């Protein structure tokens, strides 16, 4: 399956100054780890360059969409027709899920490939210089499950994309 996983607020906040726009929440980090561990993670160069993110993300197959060289060993570089390459990853690794981490432009560009979206909805609004168009993203998405965090400040939701299209 091809999925996306990200956290946002009602304004579509996604990032600020090259990193997360809020302090990491242990429960949200556990949700991320639970779903992506031993899977494939795909991200754009700006997400990869986040100074707070370990490189590579441990116990995952890391793929970076970029035209620049990647100096970290054991990281796959995707460039050119990255959507086709993401689909090819499914063939190479049939027993793994692919999680597109971001940025928002890559998530929106790949929306027609995404089977499920794992979205952490955060209460309140944070300052950001990077946003995802939540209204556009949610078109065709149907909620399959949702649960609040222990502190009730987050809501962990899974959406199924009913408008999915596979080009291969």
Give the ranges of each region predicted by the language model.
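Enzymes that bind and transform nitrogen-containing heteroaromatic metabolites
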Residues: 1-168
């Amino acid at each position: 399956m091809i999925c996306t996983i990200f956290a946002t607020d009602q304004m579509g906040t996604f990032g600020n100054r090259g990193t997360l726009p809020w302090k990491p929440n242990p429960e949200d980090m556990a949700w991320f780890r639970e779903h992506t561990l031993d899977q494939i993670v795909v991200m754009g160069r700006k997400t990869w360059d986040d100074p707070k993110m370990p490189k590579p993300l441990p116990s995952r197959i890391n793929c970076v969409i970029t035209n620049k060289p990647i100096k970290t060993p054991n990281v796959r570089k995707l460039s050119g027709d990255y959507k086709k390459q993401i689909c090819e990853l499914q063939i190479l690794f049939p027993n793994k899920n692919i999680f597109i981490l971001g940025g928002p432009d890559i998530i929106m560009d790949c929306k027609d490939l995404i089977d499920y979206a794992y979205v952490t909805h955060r209460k309140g609004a944070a300052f950001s210089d990077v946003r995802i168009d939540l209204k556009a993203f949610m078109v065709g998405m149907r909620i399959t499950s949702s649960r609040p965090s222990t502190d009730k400040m987050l809501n962990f939701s899974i959406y199924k994309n009913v408008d999915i299209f596979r080009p291969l």
